[in-house]
Amino acid sequence: MIPKDELDKAVGIAKKYGVGELYLIGSALYKEPEDVSDYDFAVRDVPVGRFFRFYGELLRVMSKNVDLIDLSGKMTKFKNIIVKEGKLIYAKTSA
């Protein structure tokens, strides 16, 4: 599993960019941190024009390379699997 400080970084960046939901997916869910080559995330409801800035900051701040999948738009079978099998690590709440 990804270390807590790395999760905290990703969540902080998600909040900064107004992300709706952030999921941890892939090998970081079940492998030991030293066995993970990169972090895989999926994101939903990123405000228009912020996706690449959000992704760029993740790439700069995280200790490993990052892959990011955009779940916005029509839900497909692939996206449904990601949501079902991934771990929701952040969800924006209505204030």
Give, region by region, the residue ranges found by the protein language model.
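Short, well-ordered beta-strand segments
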Residues: D40-A42
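Catalytic core of pol beta-like nucleotidyltransferases
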Residues: M1-Y23, L29-D35, R44-A95
